[in-house]
Amino acid sequence: AVRYLYDLGHRQIARVGGPESLAHSYIRDSAFADVASELGMRYRCLHTDYTPETGSEATKRLLSFPEHPTAIIYDNDVMALAGLGVAASQGIKVPEEISIMSWDDSFMCTAAYPNLTAMGRDVVDTGKQAAGLLLKLIDGERVGHLMEGPYELRARASTGPAPAEEKMR
């Protein structure tokens, strides 16, 4: 996701994640920071509780900075939709002035306007893996962890080339 935004010309990005105490938040934060640093991008990470309210608050905070990010990646579709709403309420055009991406890729991504670019995965396969682990637990077996991913970038209308410097707020 970070490389995709870099390839679109974005150099200042942000991530709105879930609680820092969750393992997948830590993993995503680390991967985000590592790739952004490797590419020489400026970045910020804010953490929320996954609700639309905190997604909105985080978006407002990010957009209040004099040099706000030109792209934001949200940890779920609910917060990304809230981010779209904040951008619209502030007259910021998506994707012309800011690109917005999500994790999860639920049906909400294609119902939103503009359609949300998202990182998605095969939920049926993930469900099968989870069911298999549950059956092993029921049988008294020790089980490992359900691994997240692999994810696939599903590019849609909410991401585009970074705005020219003079267009940035």
Predicted segments — roles?
Residues 1-169:
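Bacterial carbohydrate/catabolite-sensing allosteric modules
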